[in-house]
């Protein structure tokens, strides 16, 4: 008879744990913590962080210099 009470209490505890974890997983604030996939919140945050093209003046300022040695101010020949 004691074994039946033990099995019943274990079953009840398991049901409570499963229900509480499923309720926490469906709440919006903890969704990304419980699920491994991306949520809509994280996708929106990634879109906000993307760098846009900018205006024409900003794009002009970011152009890479061209020439014989655009990465160095002084041209020093390579000697082995």
UniProtKB/Swiss-Prot annotation:
Protein name from the UniProt record: CLAVATA3/ESR (CLE)-related protein 40
Recorded superkingdom: Eukaryota
Region (Disordered): 45-80
GO biological process: cell fate specification; cell-cell signaling involved in cell fate commitment; maintenance of root meristem identity; phloem development; regulation of cell differentiation
A GO term from the CC aspect: apoplast
Signal peptide limits: 1-25
Family: Belongs to the CLV3/ESR signal peptide family.
Hydroxyproline modification, residue list: 65
Coiled-coil annotated spans: none
Sample GO molecular function, one term: receptor serine/threonine kinase binding
Source species: Arabidopsis thaliana
Membrane listed as a keyword: no
Keyword annotations of the record: Developmental protein, Differentiation, Hydroxylation, Secreted, Signal
Gene: CLE40
